[in-house]
Amino acid sequence: MSETSTTTHISQVGTVMVPVSDQDLALDFYVGKLGLEKTADTPFGRGDRWVEVTPRGAQTSLALILPQEGEEVGISTRVAFASDDVDADHAALSERGVDVDEEVMRMGDPIPPMFFFRDQDGNRLLIVQRG
């Protein structure tokens, strides 16, 4: 019996898809409030658009996609952004009218400070203090 290799050529997470009800409103939120860069906005398929936003300097992007049949918006995405200063980001997003948790969670070492926030569709995302 021969061994089966479990090796792949996967090297990173490239794109995470986040379902949104309106791509223009999503761009206003992710670019205008979060400060991400719009890195793609092009026709896709039959009348659809492929819209991507990316944190500055990051290799992983978010695709802001319209939900397919049976999919919903307003989900817990499990997307976590890294930040060098979660307290400053919490304050800034709150000032911009973003739906953020009341305060930054602090559970003690080794768990870093973090907070959840919601986009214009209620999709739940997280910002975590980097190392």
Enumerate the predicted regions with their spans.
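Core segments of cupin and vicinal oxygen chelate
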Residues: I10-S11, M17-Q59
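Eukaryotic phosphotyrosine signaling hubs
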Residues: V13-T15, G74-V79
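Short hydrophobic/aromatic beta-strand micro-patches
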Residues: M17-P19, T54, A80-D84, V128
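Short amphipathic alpha-helices within nucleic acid-binding modules
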Residues: F29, D87-A92
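Short, charged/polar surface micro-motifs in flexible loops or helix N-caps
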Residues: R56-T60, E69-E72, V86-A88
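Short, charged/polar, Gly/Pro-enriched secondary-structure boundary elements
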Residues: G57-L62, G122-L125
